[in-house]
Structure formats: structure tokens, C-alpha cells
């Protein structure tokens, strides 16, 4: 991660610090950890935060992962901010010009991407090395191929291949496919592939394929489109088949040890060991005419006023856990009556780290709202109730 270390004996900084398209507006101090602060900054219209940590012998300044920037822009921001310090060490050198220019989709732009896309969508959730996903894109140039993956190394590997092979119809998104599906309108996908997911036989609630996931997949698929599971785990296959048979109307196709054109490294290893591999295709049979209404999920806040007394009480609030979602106030930062609230919240399957900014009586998410899913919206309403409770308490005690 780009960062730099600086000597402690620097003069107090005078904000704002402006250089070209960058502006470092002000510094928020942690109310929980006296050695931590957040620098509130912007690049053009994009807001981001830097973490500033005072250690025994130096300052550590690095990005805040909850407000990501493209790597080269982040390095440039840190290089500019570092000019106000006596730098001891850094890793802010410019990258080679041959570095990949292809970027993953941003979650905040994903809704617009889906809305604007007119081509049939082939989706793979958990694409690993990307062999199958890239073959899909090469063989279907008129269709949009979308890969969803959690792990950064897999995404970086596929992004390089997309650029090398000039696969303009292939896009990748970093996220949990279980939640991403919930944000997609009805009948947007032609096919969904889930190949060799982690079986999680001892922790089945962590599996990709669950009753909730299957319902969402069948909703998102076009009529006669299919969800394809490929697995070497017999128990996972059997449990998934039982889930499919729970539906009142089902069309299911099963294959065992079928030969397919693209074999992953993982699958090749099992083939050598003569291990059975199962294919389960579950077809979407019904058309859903009900309007997709995730726009009903409003992530704005009512008018709320925070002050030193209320944020002190909010910071002491324990993690609140409900069925399927939670809210945890991790930290609060302050600058002259303005507050940054650091949160972990949302769906248990994919918790989010994000920040809420309070300026005067306005409260809003920094940069982006949570992904529009039911459990995220429930967590948002819970957070709003927490903030309003202490706001109302302060008004009553005045």
C-alpha cells in the first residue's frame, strides 16, 4: 500500500493545502485514539481520506481503504502531502508506463453500468484464475461478460489479461456476488456461472449457493436462462440439488464428469486424481413483471445535529446485531464541531467499512451510499435511529 514515514518534529500544518487538482481541506482528530487522525481531501470532485498515525518515532501516513483512489492518483496525492513533512521513507515512486490501465468497475458506478448495458449479460461469480471467464468473453464478443470476485490478486491477474487480449466486452467487479445480485433488476442476465466455490461444509451459512442466493439468481436470469454450478464436492452438489427441488416449478440438468473446453488448474488436478466433478444447471422458468424497486431504498439521513456530548455517547454504543445485519460505530473524528463517524455495518455476508460526515445539521455518507440491498437498508435505518436517539436526548437535556 502506498505510504510514507515522516519525522515527528514538523510544524503544525496550515489547511487547506492546495496543489493542482488536489486539496487537503482539514484534519479530523480521533476521539478514541489520540494518536490517530484523518485528513479530509479531494481530487477534482472526488473526496478521499488519508490516515495519519503518530507512532513512537515517526508519523505513518497512508490511504484510508474505505475511500479508495486509483493507485497512481493516490501516490500523487501522498507525494504532494509529503512535501509538508521531513520524509524518512516512502514507496511513492511512479509506476512503469507499461502498467495495466484497465480498471475494475466501482461499486458506486455499478448500478449505472447495469442500467446502460443493452447486451445480454453472462456472469461468473468467483472466477479465480479467470480462464473460464476469459473464454466466455472471447467466444461471445457481442455479449457483456461480467466477473465478480472478492480476491484482489485474482482481479489484478484478469485485468492484465483483459488488456493483453483486448477483451472490450469483459468487465470485473470486486465484491460479494451474493449481495451484488440483490442490486440487479429482474431478467438482466442470460447465464450465471458458479464454478468450484468453497464448499464450507462445516459452515454452510458461508456458502455462495443458498436458498436466498438461488431466489435472487432466478429473479435476475432471463426466462430460460440458467445458473450453472460446477463442483467436485459431493455434499455441496447434493445440498444444491435439494435447494433447487424446493421450488414449485423446476427444470434441472445434471451431468457428471462432463468434458468441457476450458479446464482450470484446479479442475485439472482433480481430473488426474480421478475425482468426480458435478454440473448442476437450474433454469429460470417464470417471468417476473413486478417492477424492480431498489430505488425505494433511501440512504439519506433526516436532519440530525451532532455535538461533543452526543458523539461521546454514540462512541460508547456497543455493536448492535439484528437478524442478518448489524451496526458498529468504530471511531469518531472531530474538527471544530464537524464529525467523521467511522462505521462497520450492513449485511453479515459482506460487512462494509465506511464513513458518515456530519457538518452542522447535515449528515451524509462520504463519497458513496451502501449497495442497495434490503439488509444494508435495514442497517442504514438502524444507524439513523442511533444518531437521532442521541440528538433527541441532547435536545431534551438542554
UniProtKB/Swiss-Prot annotation:
Binding-site positions, S-adenosyl-L-methionine: 124, 149, 176
Catalytic activities: guanosine(46) in tRNA + S-adenosyl-L-methionine = N(7)-methylguanosine(46) in tRNA + S-adenosyl-L-homocysteine
Organism this protein belongs to: Helicobacter acinonychis (strain Sheeba)
The encoding gene: trmB
This protein's name: tRNA (guanine-N(7)-)-methyltransferase
One Pfam family of this chain: Methyltransf_4
Top-level lineage group: Bacteria
Coiled-coil spans in chain: none
GO molecular function: tRNA (guanine(46)-N7)-methyltransferase activity
Binding site for substrate: 232
Keyword DNA repair among UniProt keywords: no
UniProt entry tagged with the keyword Membrane: no
Stated role: Catalyzes the formation of N(7)-methylguanine at position 46 (m7G46) in tRNA.
Cross-referenced SUPFAM superfamilies: S-adenosyl-L-methionine-dependent methyltransferases
Similarity field: Belongs to the class I-like SAM-binding methyltransferase superfamily. TrmB family.
NCBIfam families per record: PRK14121.1, tRNA (guanosine(46)-N7)-methyltransferase TrmB
Pathway assigned to this chain's UniProt record: tRNA modification; N(7)-methylguanine-tRNA biosynthesis
EC class: transferase
A cellular component term, taken from the record's GO annotations: tRNA methyltransferase complex
Enzyme Commission code(s) on record: 2.1.1.33
Keywords from the named record: Methyltransferase, S-adenosyl-L-methionine, Transferase, tRNA processing
Amino acid at each position: 500500500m502506498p505510504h510514507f514515514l515522516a519525522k515527528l518534529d514538523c510544524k503544525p500544518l496550515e489547511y487547506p493545502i492546495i496543489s493542482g487538482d488536489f486539496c487537503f481541506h482539514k484534519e479530523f482528530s480521533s476521539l478514541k485514539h489520540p494518536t490517530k487522525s484523518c485528513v479530509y481531501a479531494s481530487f477534482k470532485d472526488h473526496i478521499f481520506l488519508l490516515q495519519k498515525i503518530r507512532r513512537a518515532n515517526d508519523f505513518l501516513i497512508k490511504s484510508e481503504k474505505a475511500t479508495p483512489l486509483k493507485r497512481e492518483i493516490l501516490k500523487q496525492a501522498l507525494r504532494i502531502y509529503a512535501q509538508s513533512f521531513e520524509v524518512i521513507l516512502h514507496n511513492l515512486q511512479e509506476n512503469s508506463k507499461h502498467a495495466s490501465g484497465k480498471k475494475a468497475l466501482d461499486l458506486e458506478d455499478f448500478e449505472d453500468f447495469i442500467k446502460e448495458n443493452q447486451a445480454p449479460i453472462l456472469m461468473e461469480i468467483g472466477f479465480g484464475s479467470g480462464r473460464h471467464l476469459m473464454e466466455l468473453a472471447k467466444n461471445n464478443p457481442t455479449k457483456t461478460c461480467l466477473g465478480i470476485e472478492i480476491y484482489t490478486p485474482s482481479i489484478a491477474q484478469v485485468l492484465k489479461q483483459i488488456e493483453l487480449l483486448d477483451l472490450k466486452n469483459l468487465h470485473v467487479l470486486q465484491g460479494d456476488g451474493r449481495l451484488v445480485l440483490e442490486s440487479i433488476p429482474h431478467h438482466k442476465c442470460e447465464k450465471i456461472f458458479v464454478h468450484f466455490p468453497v464448499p464450507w461444509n462445516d459452515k454452510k451459512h458461508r456458502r455462495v449457493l443458498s436458498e436466498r442466493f438461488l431466489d435472487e439468481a432466478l429473479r435476475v436470469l432471463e426466462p430460460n436462462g440458467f445458473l450453472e454450478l460446477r463442483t467436485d464436492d459431493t455434499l455441496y452438489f447434493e445440498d444444491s440439488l435439494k435447494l433447487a427441488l424446493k421450488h414449485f416449478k423446476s427444470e434441472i440438468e445434471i451431468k457428471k464428469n462432463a468434458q468441457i473446453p476450458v479446464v482450470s488448474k484446479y479442475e485439472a488436478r482433480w481430473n488426474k486424481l480421478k475425482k468426480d466433478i458435478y454440473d448442476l444447471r437450474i433454469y429460470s422458468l417464470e417471468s417476473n413483471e413486478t417492477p424492480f424497486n431498489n430505488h425505494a431504498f433511501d440512504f439519506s439521513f433526516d436532519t440530525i445535529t451532532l455535538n461533543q456530548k452526543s458523539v461521546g455517547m454514540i462512541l460508547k454504543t456497543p455493536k448492535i446485531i439484528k437478524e442478518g445485519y448489524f451496526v458498529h460505530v468504530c471511531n469518531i473524528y472531530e474538527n471544530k464541531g464537524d464529525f467523521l463517524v467511522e462505521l462497520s455495518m450492513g449485511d453479515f455476508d459482506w460487512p462494509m467499512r465506511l464513513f458518515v460526515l456530519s457538518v452542522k445539521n447535515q449528515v451524509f455518507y462520504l463519497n458513496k451510499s451502501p449497495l442497495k440491498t434490503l439488509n444494508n437498508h435495514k442497517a442504514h435505518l438502524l444507524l439513523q435511529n442511533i444518531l437521532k436517539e442521541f440528538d433527541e436526548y441532547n435536545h431534551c437535556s438542554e
